[in-house]
């Protein structure tokens, strides 16, 4: 019986290419997709974009806001990893409200849903990401700063058509982050602003161990629990111009992932002592270009649009979003 289990393990190795030497860039496209799905929610900057974008609108002197405001925002994202070995697309929508909690402080809450699809080789994956969170921002003189925190539940679906594998599993995420920005021309009274900035993003992803039937094997395939800590930061400069009915801005920054970009995935077959391990090292260094602006539509309604390009050595992302703000 033990020999049979070893045969099934060998079949598993052949089917999904679980290489014994888990070196970066040597994994199969299917493995790469599996590893990317594990860190996808942590890499997302949606929460940062929602909180920071909302507060930037509030701090725009040309856009009206009141003690309590509501906002609605959606964005799309297109991704490529491993020199196009894996591609993906995301759609997200979020809604929230905020209020004045001090002379210079604004505090809000929000909820978000994000839908991500990834494709690589003969595999495809789907991730559904639900979040609730809060944010707080303060503008004092030339300084603008904010922080945010959120909690989310993830529904993951991985399908490998080659061997008829169709797995579903869940995870949880806790994230926090923030940004500090200083306007070098705050006291000039000019419509042009030059602002160096630095931001940080940290999160923990928690996925319990789960087991699924494996085609042709008498026992289940077991995925060991994943607990991954992720940390990234970015620094750069923002050029912004204020207009009579809004503003527009350009950002150029350098992003660095310090930890958690390559969680280790471990699989085993029930009844067999051997385990199979692999990970995929996503790029750690990126150039980040962002273009955006806000336009006042009516007395109480404004719209914000933004596009961004994130470029690494092997991986890249393209982002676009739009937001509506209501002041009551």
Each model region followed by its residue ranges:
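Membrane translocator/pore-forming domains, dominated by Gram-negative outer-membrane beta-barrels
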Residues: 27, 66-69, 74-328
